[in-house]
Regions:
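Amphipathic, well-ordered alpha-helical segments in soluble domains
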Residues: 26, 86-89, 126, 181-184, ...
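Alpha-helical phosphate/pyrophosphate-handling elements in metalloenzyme active cores
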Residues: 39-83, 171-211, 247-252, 296-327
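All-alpha helical catalytic cores of prenyl diphosphate-utilizing isoprenoid enzymes
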Residues: 2, 31, 35, 50-54, ...
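Conserved N-terminal diphosphate/IPP-binding helix and adjacent helical/loop segment
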Residues: 1-89, 93, 97-112, 160-168, ...
């Protein structure tokens, strides 16, 4: 199993004695996937999966589901959790191709080591294998949820490309893009976990949506404010790529000179950092954080009243952990 971050380790402990074992099974399932592909894609799939990460989406699915009633239910949850992570990994591989990214989580990307074609094929296979996992048990609910999430991911990516370089993007348009591109997979994780754990999927889907949106908003704040030694990338990387985020949108509403900025004219990290300083000089970062905190509070309020204490505590920790990651 990949080493958890301190925040993730706390969530694992809070989720109950069954969570570490289930996560180990998810990790074993991912390792089995990576080892089953053969040449030439196998090593690249393994490279992607072994890069680790927080495994937040699989963990969220398992926490929502609660302790399984038997091995058949546990196996279904493990497969679905692994599928969620495979889809998330696929999106990262494809993002690296679109962004010409050489590093991901401090490691070389498939794009940088094998080129854009091999990276594209690797991402495609990750997507395909995710659906193979959830169809093995005839899990049509998970198939439907993951299909909807993948459709949303694609639409969100298209919106991001359409909005590139445009500082006149509205807050509503930005939030819709985030809902599609980021929150949709959180929604699917929570809905699948709820279905497997005997809960109504709809309020849990809404819980996941708020958590995913807060996660993305705070990530965008960190792109402007975060030191490179913490984020692993220079400040303003999104701005250099032409990605218009909430801090920029709010700053443009407050400072006409920012609204008039031509993002295409940002030639290097130093210029992007200068724009970050101008954004930070407004209250845009504080307002972005405040919106994220509102979403976290809304997420907690969506947890069902009859939810058992263990699940409630662990899911509230997830919500708080999204904020703590950026404090």
């Amino acid at each position: 199993m990949t080493d958890p971050t301190p925040q993730t380790a706390e969530l694992v402990r809070a989720g109950g004695d069954h969570i570490p074992g289930l996560l180990k099974r998810v990790e074993a399932q991912l390792k089995e996937e990576a080892g089953s592909w053969g040449q030439p894609l196998g090593p690249h799939g393994g490279q992607t999966i072994s890069a680790g990460g927080k495994r937040l989406r699989p963990l969220l699915l398992l926490l929502v589901a609660g302790e399984p009633s038997g091995d058949a239910q546990a196996e279904r949850l493990v497969r679905a959790a692994a599928a969620i992570e495979l889809i998330h990994s696929a999106t990262l591989v494809h993002d690296d191709v679109l962004d010409n990214a050489d590093l991901r989580r401090g490691r070389p990307t498939v794009f940088s080591t094998a080129g854009p074609e091999m990276a594209t094929y690797t991402g495609d296979l990750l997507f395909a294998r995710a659906f193979t996992l959830v169809t093995q048990d005839g899990d049509l609910f998970s198939v439907r949820e993951l299909s909807e999430a993948c459709s949303a991911l694609a639409r969100g990516e298209l919106l991001q490309r359409e909005d590139a370089w445009n500082t006149a993007v509205t807050v509503d348009r930005y939030l819709e893009r985030c809902r599609l591109k980021t929150a949709a997979l959180f929604e699917a994780a929570c809905a699948i976990g709820a279905d497997g754990g005997g809960l109504d999927p709809e309020p849990m889907r809404d819980f996941g949506s708020r958590i995913g949106l807060a996660f993305q908003l705070l990530d965008d704040v960190l792109d402007v404010s975060g030191p490179p030694e913490r984020t692993g990338k220079p400040r303003g990387t999104d701005l250099l790529d032409g990605t218009v985020t909430l801090p920029l949108i709010l700053a443009a509403e407050r400072d006409p000179s920012i609204a008039a900025t031509d993002l295409r004219a940002l030639q290097d990290s130093e210029a992007a950092a200068g724009l970050c300083d101008r954004i930070a000089a407004t209250d845009a970062l504080e307002q972005s954080r405040a919106r994220a905190l509102e979403m976290v509070a809304e997420a907690k309020g969506l947890l069902p009243e009859g939810l058992d204490e263990e699940r409630r505590d662990s899911l509230e920790l997830v919500a708080d952990g999204v904020v703590a990651r950026y404090s």
